[in-house]
């Protein structure tokens, strides 16, 4: 991933789970590689990942996540966890779009590494970002102001205090039981 040349990558209708957070980052494109676009649609990421997206390409790239569910990710408490999204080697000409996604259990409460489970660690996001109609629940460090580049900058968020009441999250069934949350139609559509 340090010298790869990628054009357009699409991940659609996938479930990716149980990737040990101690083993590394989720989508990992290091400096020296090239990417035109990464589009992730209607997919679920569950249990694992240190930094979820580590995109350090230096060229202009477009990255988007649409209707995805993130469950129990970025929970490793060490200095290698830079939160959910990292695009720190590019410029403001690059784009990161996160739309209609559901986030549950991102990070941990009171971590030693204050960047664990944040949206983007300070200084680790240079792309222009767009966050639209996302839903967050039980993400205690997501908008931590001490080491996050963003502090609750989500102005278009549904009721983040309503428990989604997953049917059986421990077994991988993230079907939403709470009708109020289900009606929001955010996250991977297979679950609502």
Where are the model-predicted features located?
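Extracellular beta-rich repeat passengers
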Residues: 1-173, 188-190
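Active-site and glycan-interaction determinants of carbohydrate-active enzymes
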Residues: 176-192
């Amino acid at each position: 991933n340090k010298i790869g040349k990628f054009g357009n990558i699409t991940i659609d209708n996938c479930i990716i789970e149980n990737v040990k957070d101690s083993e590394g980052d989720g989508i990992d494109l290091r400096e020296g590689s090239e990417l035109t676009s990464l589009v992730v649609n209607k997919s679920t990421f569950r249990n694992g990942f240190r930094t979820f997206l580590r995109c350090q390409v230096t060229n202009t790239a477009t990255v988007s996540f649409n209707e995805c569910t993130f469950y129990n990710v970025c929970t490793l408490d060490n200095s290698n966890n830079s939160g959910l999204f990292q695009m720190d080697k590019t410029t403001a000409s690059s784009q990161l779009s996160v739309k209609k996604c559901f986030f549950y259990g991102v990070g941990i409460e009171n971590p030693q590494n204050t960047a664990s489970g944040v949206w983007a660690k300070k200084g680790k996001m240079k792309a222009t970002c767009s966050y639209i109609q996302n839903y967050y629940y039980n993400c205690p460090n997501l908008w931590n102001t001490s080491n996050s580049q963003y502090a609750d900058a989500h102005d278009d968020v549904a009721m983040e205090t309503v428990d989604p009441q997953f049917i059986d999250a421990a077994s991988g069934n993230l079907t939403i039981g709470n009708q109020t949350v289900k009606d929001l139609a955010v996250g991977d559509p297979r679950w609502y």
